[in-house]
């Protein structure tokens, strides 16, 4: 008999984020009313954060299979075959709401959580990336949020000993009070068998390892599935507290345990803690789990069953272990200074049964919590929202005529979204483990060397590497979520191609406002459609990811301020030879500069434009128009050409055109090398601002030295469908000179550009 003390049902439903209809469904499934602990279990497991009740039908449209995909959606992380015996686990997740109320710990535990997803699969973490969004830094509150978030990421990653090698940071008023903190991790498989999470073997013991359980992080999953308001500051107990040094030991102990073969299933305790780990293990295995809370190592006294089940204390894992091997396994963890306790067993009956003080504290069908969960039905708008349709009527002719190209470029280089992120990157240890080939700022994607992992002699030493990037043009997504999401996938693939990596697979983090408004759900649905289309065309299946909804903040007048929809794309690619990796800096004077993709003078190509561009926002102070429509077939062809040129050793540099367009990309390569350029652009009938600052067009800038010129011409001659335009050359004199047919349009010292570019963030952060 399940104990069931009386409680205020209406108040409890509100606390758990459940609806009256959810109560009715829970009662139907149980055949009785749930007790308070059981209601808490349903509250976290039926939240958007855990069960994707608003987004699951949309996610089902993603391509998830491919010849390199070893593990797709449904496990703790995706796994791809990199070749040469190397298998890579990777995933991205958000910690947005916790970071809004407690930026340091919210961001730090986001890093800890994504690392656990990786090593739970049997993979050793080798790299971290992140995608961050903040409000304007003119607001001291946003400065404080950014300082805390970056410090938290740096603290956890640096202490645990995993390099933070890449990422992106962008700013917009829509993120004020609701920052986005998305963390991505990569890991190399160390075990012959990939460790799965489904419970196996009736009677097998269930073992808890890691840290103790306390009251921190209570209800974190439900908290992450609600809007933010001024009262959210009172929810600091819903933010977990991490210990990276303990996690470092946990990584080593877990990898040892997995290598022993004693562990048959593993699940980390992240969102929803013990409730999620037990129910997911049971549901995925088609079995049940019995859990005795009296055996769970606790750091506080007097904890209730509800508190044990919903605690999100960090650095904890749950294992199903081969019968008879539990004592040896627990001794292994204790040698690492970690807690280890036998807390339950696998049941034949597919239920989650929880014992506390010798009585049954909860008993729930496993699938009711982790498989057969509710799906919200939303009507999809048949036409785009009226406000967007009105904005789409804007044309480039409404922009004022560009009068000072040099001043416009300097303003763009001072834009915190475009400017150097060295203020951020210098806080991260990018070189720990000594495998980082290229990190943030030096190239369009990070590259990490693949070395034989400890205790795994089956992987021969090689010159292979893995490249990774995170991308999202949130201005484009705000105006057209389908085109913007396509552009996010396209830019990620282009960034990988620019270092010579073959794009392989995607992990996505969908950061969106409430789906309960017609516009909110339409934005989410259109972005999912865009991701699906782009991933199919570019042959990059989705292996999993994260959905973070209700990213909006209640204003003083009671209205909700939604963020720009931000579908962040994390993408990984294989590098056959790290000695060929290409960076964005010019290499030597005299090298010829080429533009691959839509030429600058093309004033009509729909894949290139100023709508949604950094230049438009800088000039008008707002966004308008419909962003360019990505040509995914051209995108694939451009990427293929760039990768082939790098493989043949023909390119001295490669850099994609994204925020700020052609002029900003050229300036960035000058700043990175302290070399100049002499470039002549044909303007044709196009306006100068379009030639210099338009975005889109599947464009990559490359430089080629004289010795490689014949082979380069032969290669581009074999790709006649692609437009390749020679722009000019690299110069020893560090000046950025851009001419049109009629005159010098822009002439700036590279040193002046660099000073603006590098000082933009420190100046706003009030630091050196």
From Swiss-Prot:
Positions contributing to Mg(2+) 2 binding: 117, 268
Location(s), subcellular: Cytoplasm
Record-listed Mg(2+) 1 binding positions: 93, 546
Keywords associated with the record: ATP-binding, Cytoplasm, Ligase, Magnesium, Metal-binding, Nucleotide-binding, Purine biosynthesis
Self-association state and partner proteins as the record states: Monomer. Part of the FGAM synthase complex composed of 1 PurL, 1 PurQ and 2 PurS subunits.
Primary site of residence: cytoplasm
Matching HAMAP family: PurL_2
PANTHER family (alphabetical): PHOSPHORIBOSYLFORMYLGLYCINAMIDINE SYNTHASE SUBUNIT PURL
Gene Ontology terms, MF aspect: ATP binding; magnesium ion binding; phosphoribosylformylglycinamidine synthase activity
Binding-site list for substrate: 94-97, 116, 240, 312-314, 548
Annotated InterPro entries: PRibForGlyAmidine_synth_PurL, PurL_linker, PurM-like_C_dom, PurM-like_C_sf, PurM-like_N, PurM-like_N_sf
Gene Ontology terms: biological process: 'de novo' IMP biosynthetic process
Pfam families found in the cross-reference section: AIRS (PF00586), AIRS_C (PF02769), FGAR-AT_linker (PF18072)
Organism classification: Bacteria, Bacillati, Cyanobacteriota, Cyanophyceae, Synechococcales
Keyword Iron assigned: no
Enzyme Commission number(s): 6.3.5.3
NCBIfam families per the UniProt record, alphabetical: FGAM_synth_II, PRK01213.1
Function, in words: Part of the phosphoribosylformylglycinamidine synthase complex involved in the purines biosynthetic pathway. Catalyzes the ATP-dependent conversion of formylglycinamide ribonucleotide (FGAR) and glutamine to yield formylglycinamidine ribonucleotide (FGAM) and glutamate. The FGAM synthase complex is composed of three subunits. PurQ produces an ammonia molecule by converting glutamine to glutamate. PurL transfers the ammonia molecule to FGAR to form FGAM in an ATP-dependent manner.
UniProt family annotation: Belongs to the FGAMS family.
Protein name, UniProt field: Phosphoribosylformylglycinamidine synthase subunit PurL
């Amino acid at each position: 008999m399940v104990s069931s003390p009386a409680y205020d049902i209406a108040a409890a439903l509100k606390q758990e984020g459940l609806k009256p209809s959810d109560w009715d469904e829970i009662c139907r499934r149980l055949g009785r009313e749930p007790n308070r602990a059981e209601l808490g279990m349903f509250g976290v497991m039926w939240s958007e954060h855990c069960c994707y009740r608003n987004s699951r039908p949309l996610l089902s449209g993603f391509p998830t299979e491919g010849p390199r995909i070893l593990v797709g959606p449904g496990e703790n992380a995706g796994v791809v075959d990199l070749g040469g015996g190397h298998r890579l686990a990777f995933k991205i997740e958000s910690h947005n709401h916790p970071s809004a109320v407690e930026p340091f710990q919210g961001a730090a535990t986001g890093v800890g959580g994504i690392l656990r997803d990786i090593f739970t699969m049997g993979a050793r973490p080798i790299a971290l990336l992140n995608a961050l969004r903040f409000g304007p830094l003119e607001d001291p509150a946003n400065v404080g949020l950014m300082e805390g978030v970056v410090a938290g990421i740096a603290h956890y990653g640096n202490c645990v000993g995993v390099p933070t090698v890449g990422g992106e940071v962008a700013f917009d008023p829509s993120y004020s009070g609701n920052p986005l903190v998305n963390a991505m991790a990569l890991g190399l498989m160390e075990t012959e068998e990939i460790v799965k999470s489904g419970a196996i073997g009736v009677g097998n013991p269930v073992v808890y390892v890691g840290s103790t359980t306390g009251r921190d992080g209570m209800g974190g999953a439900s908290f992450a599935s609600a809007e933010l308001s001024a009262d959210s500051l009172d929810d600091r107990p819903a933010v977990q507290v991490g210990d990276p040094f303990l996690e470092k030991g946990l990584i080593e102990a877990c990898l040892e345990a997995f290598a022993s073969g004693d562990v048959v299933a593993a699940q980390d305790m992240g969102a929803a803690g013990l409730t999620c780990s037990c129910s997911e293990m049971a549901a995925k295995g088609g079995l049940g789990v019995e859990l005795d809370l009296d055996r769970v190592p606790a750091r506080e006294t007097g904890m209730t069953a509800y508190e044990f089940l919903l605690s999100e204390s960090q650095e904890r894992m749950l294992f199903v272990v081969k019968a008879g091997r539990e004592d040896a396994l627990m001794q292994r963890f204790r040698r690492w200074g970690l807690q280890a306790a036998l807390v339950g067993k696998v049941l034949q009956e597919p239920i989650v049964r929880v014992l506390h003080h010798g009585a049954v504290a909860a008993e729930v069908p496993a699938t009711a919590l982790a498989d057969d969960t509710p799906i919200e039905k939303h009507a999809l708008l048949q036409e785009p929202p009226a406000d967007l349709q009105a904005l789409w009527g804007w044309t480039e002719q409404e922009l004022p005529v560009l009068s000072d190209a040099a001043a416009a470029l300097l303003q763009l280089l001072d834009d915190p979204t475009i400017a150097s992120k060295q203020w951020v990157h210098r806080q991260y240890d990018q070189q720990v483990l000594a495998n980082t080939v290229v990190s943030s700022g030096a190239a369009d994607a990070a590259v990490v060397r693949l070395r034989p992992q400890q205790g795994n002699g089956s992987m021969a030493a090689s010159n292979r590497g893995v490249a990774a990037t995170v991308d999202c043009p949130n201005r484009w997504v705000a105006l057209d979520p389908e085109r913007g999401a396509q552009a996010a996938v396209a830019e990620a693939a282009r960034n990988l191609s620019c270092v010579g990596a073959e794009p392989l697979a995607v992990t996505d983090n969908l950061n969106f406002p409430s789906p309960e408004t017609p516009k909110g759900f339409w934005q989410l649905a259109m972005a999912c459609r865009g991701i699906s289309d782009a991933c199919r065309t570019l042959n990059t299946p989705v292996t999993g990811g994260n959905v973070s909804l209700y990213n909006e903040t209640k204003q003083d007048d009671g209205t909700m301020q939604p963020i720009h929809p931000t579908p962040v794309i994390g993408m990984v690619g294989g590098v056959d030879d790290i000695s060929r990796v290409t960076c964005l800096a010019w290499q030597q004077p005299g090298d010829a500069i080429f533009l691959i993709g839509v030429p600058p003078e093309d004033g009509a190509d729909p894949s290139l434009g100023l709508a949604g561009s950094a230049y438009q926002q800088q000039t008008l102070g707002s966004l308008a128009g419909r962003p360019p429509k990505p040509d995914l077939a051209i995108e694939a062809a451009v990427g293929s050409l760039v990768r082939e040129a790098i493989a043949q050793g023909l390119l001295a540099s490669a850099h994609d055109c994204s925020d700020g367009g052609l002029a900003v990309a050229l300036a960035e390569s000058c700043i990175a090398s302290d070399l100049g350029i002499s470039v002549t652009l044909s303007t044709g009938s196009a306006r100068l601002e379009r030639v210099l600052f338009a975005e889109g067009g599947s464009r990559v800038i490359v430089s080629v030295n004289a010795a490689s010129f014949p082979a380069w011409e032969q290669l581009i001659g074999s790709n006649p469908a692609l437009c390749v335009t020679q722009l000019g050359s690299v110069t020893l004199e560090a000046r950025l000179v851009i001419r049109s047919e009629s005159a010098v349009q822009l002439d700036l010292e590279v040193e002046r550009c660099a000073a603006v570019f590098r000082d933009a963030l420190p100046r706003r952060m009030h630091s050196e």
